């Protein structure tokens, strides 16, 4: 990641009257490791629900590859568990396909390629990891490439975007894809707010959010003291989003040497660090239509907590 982007984002967010920083700032190797631990918690359902979806519907998904040669592209590499279920199904059915995961982290790509090669070493799996920004990577793949594409955008990454940002993201994807290409995209559905509060309030989520302060200290020579902040997430019924905050437990001034600035916190002043919007099916239908896609099928887990929605490009 370019340092100036990190620095500019931090300065802009901490200068707001209501301080707010995007959650992508948390993700370095340690931040990713903490989040992987979160996905294994009993109360944190999205990863478990999505793995169930892939195990239940992998045969249906594999049929999309049988009619024409297809390139499987994944935005964000993750740990490969969900994708592995689909890849195994495709290999067992003798389907020919190319798999290209795209991630800005070289370590994440190298780790995923290693895991998949170990699991499918006796197969003819054609995998090429790409270290790049999503759009730069997708543009390099689609240029002069007429293979049909199946793009996977799994997990809750889109849920973490503001609705206008989500629309902008999807419209950019649409521009890079060809008519009748597929997009399989994960959505966390609206549910009992008590379940949401349980999912986002625990020691690991606090550790994850506080790691943001470590990153600012490390990258920008700041002096945040994590012991002077506590984390709490709340469901906001107006925005239909779980919003996570760090609360300053005292009046304090933070020095950020690389930015040549001081940031003041009042006692119990908040810094918003995360947001995760919860969707209805109607929301998803509208989002697909406004972004240039049509929904061909929705795949749910047994509790209907989560949906992987299969979209096709309209042009």
Regions found by a protein language model. Give the residues of each.
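Conserved beta-strand signature within the Rossmann-like core of class I S-adenosyl-L-methionine
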Residues: 176-192
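Class I SAM-dependent methyltransferase Rossmann-like catalytic core
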Residues: 18-64
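Conserved SAM-binding loop of SAM-dependent methyltransferases across substrates and taxa
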Residues: 79-94
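Conserved SAM/SAH-binding beta-strand->alpha-helix loop
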Residues: 103-107
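A short glycine-rich, Lys/Arg-flanked "PGG" loop and its adjoining helix->strand segment in the class I
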Residues: 167-179
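Conserved class I S-adenosyl-L-methionine
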Residues: 68-78
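Conserved SAM-binding strand-loop segment of SAM-dependent methyltransferases
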Residues: 122-136
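Substrate-binding/catalytic lobe of Class I Rossmann-like enzymes that use SAM or dcSAM, i.e.
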Residues: 197-277, 281, 285-291
